[in-house]
């Protein structure tokens, strides 16, 4: 390439990147919003550089576009301050952060005493990165306005993720089974892994449902939210996840149950009445559908629902977990070390990580790390329940809608974690951060708003009020 075109290309790419980097360094909250927008983009640098799936330098396989953004945000917040005088510092919120830090320490101990050795360094760096992101979010989300803008960025990320999944399903339907959005006949969107798409969609759908079922939202806004829910659901179907389809449908039903119990009962009765005939029609034409969709509904044609028949790989992992936990009950085999044990325990078994998040933590970090993580997850769930109870007593429709969306979103990704390992996914920890920040900021705003006559709702335009 000649020097002139190369210089022009460098300027075209370098100037915007330099501007964004400077903006993030000077205003760290801008970096947080950009990081949230990049949550549905987990294609690694190796993918973008053209390497085949899971090949290339190990650092490029782990590095994503959002990682430099988070690093600049952290440096900017450290050197320039967070720009917010109010931080999430209530006792329960601090306890969740401390539990995550304790889990990182347990990972270090497990890596030192386990069998993985230096192979655990990447996993340790990942856990540290997740802890850093949680602390940053809680430090930067100290005001209602910032929380509102962050939730707007979260919905924007949901639009990107759902639309990418929907477009991927359309391409797969037309026979294009390998492209940027489809991997081997299954939709992955802009995610590096197929399971990441499913987990992200079930986490963001409740927030779209909050807008779709809101009486205060305009008709066009409700139609738009409804379309996003359908497109996101289509992406989950195209990804070939049987569990993802069930959990996504359940999250929509739970939000409908919160909004209108009678309407939820009507839809439930209609589904029960027409499920049998729809099941038969789907079973007859299932072989004509693309692979991803066919896989999502493959249990329609199954006569035996035993785990060994449905998923041999999961059965091998469960057998491996029993052996691993029996031999390493306290500190586990080390972060990232479970996969190597599968072929050692099960002859001919495939080396892959445990699909169950909670059993995977117990196997890799033992009872010590597993109990710390389970305590963290339980504490976050308790916090969402308390926020929902507070919002119900406060009779604030805006807070109630936000609490319902947060509870369903968190419960959905916890259920999904029973079937796929999701504790390393960034959007999972973003939802955890929302369980820490959202109740604190809203209760603080509510207490301060009693003095003021006119006030702006923290979630106005994001989770519309039902008034």
Which residue stretches match the model-derived regions?
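Alpha-helical transmembrane segments of multi-pass inner-membrane proteins
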Residues: 1, 15-23, 74, 101-112, ...
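N-terminal signal-anchor transmembrane segment
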Residues: 1-82, 109-113, 430
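Short aromatic-rich membrane-water interface segments that cap or initiate transmembrane helices
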Residues: 55-65, 183-196
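Aromatic-anchored transmembrane helix interface
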Residues: 63-69, 95-105, 117-142, 158, ...
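Transmembrane alpha-helices of multi-pass inner-membrane enzymes
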Residues: 72, 376-379, 405-467
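Long extracytoplasmic/lumenal interhelical loops at the membrane interface
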Residues: 178, 301-319, 323-365, 388-391
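Flexible juxtamembrane loops connecting transmembrane helices in multi-pass membrane enzymes
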Residues: 181-190, 279-319, 340-343
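Hydrophobic transmembrane alpha-helices and their immediate junctions
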Residues: 365-412, 439-440
């Amino acid at each position: 390439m000649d020097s002139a075109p190369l210089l022009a290309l460098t300027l075209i790419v370098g100037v915007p990147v330099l501007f964004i980097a400077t903006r993030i360094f000077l205003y760290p909250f801008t970096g947080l919003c950009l990081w949230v927008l990049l949550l549905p983009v987990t294609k690694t640098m190796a993918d973008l550089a053209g390497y085949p799936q899971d090949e290339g330098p190990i650092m490029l396989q782990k590095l994503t576009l959002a990682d430099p953004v988070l690093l600049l945000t952290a440096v900017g917040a450290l050197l320039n301050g967070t720009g917010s005088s109010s931080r999430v510092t209530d006792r329960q919120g601090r306890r969740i952060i401390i539990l995550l830090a304790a889990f990182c320490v347990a990972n270090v101990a497990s890596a030192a005493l386990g069998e993985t050795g230096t192979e655990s360094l990447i996993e340790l760096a990942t856990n540290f990165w997740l802890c850093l992101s949680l602390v940053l979010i809680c430090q930067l989300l100290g005001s209602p306005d910032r929380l509102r803008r962050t939730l707007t960025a979260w919905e924007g990320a949901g639009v990107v993720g759902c639309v990418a999944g929907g477009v991927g399903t359309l391409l797969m339907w037309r026979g294009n089974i390998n492209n940027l959005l489809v991997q081997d006949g299954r939709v992955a969107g802009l995610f590096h892994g197929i399971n990441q798409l499913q987990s992200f969609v079930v986490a963001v759908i409740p927030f779209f449902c909050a807008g779709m079922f809101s009486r205060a939202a305009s008709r066009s806004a409700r139609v738009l939210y409804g379309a996003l829910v359908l497109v996101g659901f289509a992406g989950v179907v195209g990804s070939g996840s049987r569990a993802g389809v069930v959990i996504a449908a359940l999250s929509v039903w739970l939000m409908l149950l919160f909004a209108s119990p009678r309407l939820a009962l009507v839809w439930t009765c209609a589904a029960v009445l027409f499920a049998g005939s729809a099941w038969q029609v789907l079973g007859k034409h299932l072989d004509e559908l693309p692979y991803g969709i066919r896989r999502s509904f493959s249990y329609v044609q199954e006569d035996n629902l035993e785990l060994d028949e449905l998923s041999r790989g999961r059965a091998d992992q469960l057998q491996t977990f029993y052996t691993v936990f029996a031999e390493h009950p306290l500190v586990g085999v080390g972060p990232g070390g479970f996969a190597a044990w599968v072929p050692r325990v099960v002859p001919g078994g495939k080396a892959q990580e445990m699909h169950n998040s909670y059993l995977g933590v117990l196997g890799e970090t033992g009872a010590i790390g597993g109990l710390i993580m389970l305590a963290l997850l339980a504490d976050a769930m308790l916090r969402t329940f308390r926020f929902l109870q507070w919002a119900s007593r406060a009779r604030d429709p805006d807070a109630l809608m936000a609490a319902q969306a947060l509870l369903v979103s968190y419960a959905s990704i916890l259920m999904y974690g029973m079937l796929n390992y999701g504790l390393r996914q960034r959007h999972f920890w973003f939802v955890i951060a929302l369980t820490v920040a959202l109740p604190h900021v809203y209760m603080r705003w509510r207490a301060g708003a009693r003095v003021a006559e006119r006030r702006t709702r923290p979630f106005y335009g994001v989770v519309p009020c039902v008034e």
